Amino acid sequence: MPPDLIATYTKDLNIELFGGKELLETFHFFTKEGGLFRADEYLVTGGDYQYYLDVYSVGCTTEDFYLEHGSDLLDSGINQQDLVNTLLELDMEDELTTKRIGRIAYKDFNFYELDGTTVTAKQIKSAVIDNDFRGAGLASNIYRMLTEKHDYIVCDNVQSIAGGSLWASSILTIAEVRIYDINKRKFVDVLGRRGRGINGFVPWSCQTLTADQILEWGRSYSHDTCHHIVNVISKDSLFDI
């Protein structure tokens, strides 16, 4: 709910989440910055959240081959799914160098659409990416993938500066981002540049940030708490690639 911004947070990717888990689906995607990735989606029972997504960098028996060959295929105009299928059909994964580099945790979140119907979205509660892969184009691919499957994705009510910046920049490049007021049960604006809605609504607050951290944020912010506000993207609002 954009949220109060906090300076940062850290989580250990090697810690297994509490609760029983069931594998729901496995996705693959490719980026020119990072190569081939796999994402395993789990349903969790008895844990803090209902779902989580483990993200892996897929190793190759020939170093950098996935990255180089995939980039060539991408430059040729091939679509993402055909590119991924081509790389997987080569059967060149090196399981010893495949490693977990990210984890996204999320839960069900209900809100009202413009026509008054109740919609169940997935609200992101934690998004952690290994430092070595934070420039690998993962976030936009993962959020697009989750939106295509679950129809609606909603941000958390507390975000790190990096998490808020993700929604205020990268997410804007993949979809229209609508601003929703939980108390009023309606959408109040559409997010534009610099952390401000196109009609002037500001969906972020900085209650606990220092002056230096507010400078690091570098965008508009509200002096009033924004715990009742969320940013929402939907499958229908995704931009064509």
How would you name each of these model-derived features?
Residues 161:
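Short, basic-rich loop-to-helix N-cap that marks the start of a DNA-contacting helix
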Residues 1-130, 144-154, 164-168, 172-241:
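Non-catalytic substrate-recognition and accessory regions of acyl/acetyltransferase enzymes
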Residues 134-146:
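Glycine-rich acyl-CoA binding loop
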